[in-house]
Amino acid sequence: MRKLLCSALLLAAAFAGRAQDPNFSQFFASPLTLNPALTGKFDGDFRVAGNYRNQWPTINNAFTTATVSFDIGLLKDRIPEFDQFGLGVMAFSDKSGNGVLQNNFAALSLSYHKALDENGFNQLGLGFQGTYSNKRLDITKVVFLDQLTANGFTGITNEIFSQNQLNVSYLDVNAGILYNGTTDGSNNFYLGASMYHINRPKESFQGGQYYLDPRLTIQAGGMLPRGEFDAIHFSAIHSRQANAVNTVIGGAYMLNLNADPENPTNLYMGSWFRLGDAIIPYVGLEFNSFHLGFTYDANMSSLKPASNMRGGAEISLVYIKRPVDPNRRKLNCPRF
């Protein structure tokens, strides 16, 4: 193995960090990274979602992650009334060590949800996703052990590379299943599972034999109305990839500020918890078909001294184009 030093952070990102995919605290606002079966699973004409996360900003922008997705329901006049057929595309970028290591993804997703009863109150769906991935290591930003002198890392390295950037690309296959239900049309609950890296693609800069471990994620949640203009939303995920485990659970209280159920302005306040790691306060605002969310991770783990309890900020924005027909029957979908 080459005498790569980088720093403790970069080593964790480029090597040990391989064991875990990038993830969002607002997982519920990033549907196509959570479960391919969520593709097209919304009540509207189309959906656009964007997410940005800056993790551990006090440690030289350790990790920045951004994604944008677009999905749409297809063949609505050719399939049964409460079935849903979805198509989606997604772009995803993740940078580690202030841009030393970059991961870029482009994905195409398909899903189909079958109504299990005549009212569409219970549905079961499957989703599949194909992803093109590229990982790049910028050698010009890397520090080697033989550059260490009495004055710091000021020497010239003897390491030789044929190019300033090392690249590896591969194709990835992901899939998911989702159950979605309601007891009377006003509440909602869902349970799903997704598997990423099913084909275990090879990922190595120098011809090694490193293969991505599959990531299994189980997700669940629901919405319970308390009155005409307020409700409780709750959700949780548990994911495992090799030895990396991530469990997040929490909820938010929603209040309709304008007392208008058809064109609401909703305020969300709550918190999620990443077990063994962080408290994640959440504030959200829903208006004119937009849903804006903001979280801030407060580290409570062993990283607390290094991060000064500043785990990172995250923002999400989701837009759903609502149908113009006021008399249509609403579709039963997860309500995040």
Regions found by a protein language model. Give the residues of each.
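Sec/Tat signal peptide C-region and signal peptidase I cleavage site
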Residues: 15-19
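Subset of outer-membrane beta-barrel
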Residues: 20-336
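Sec-dependent N-terminal signal peptides
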Residues: 4-13
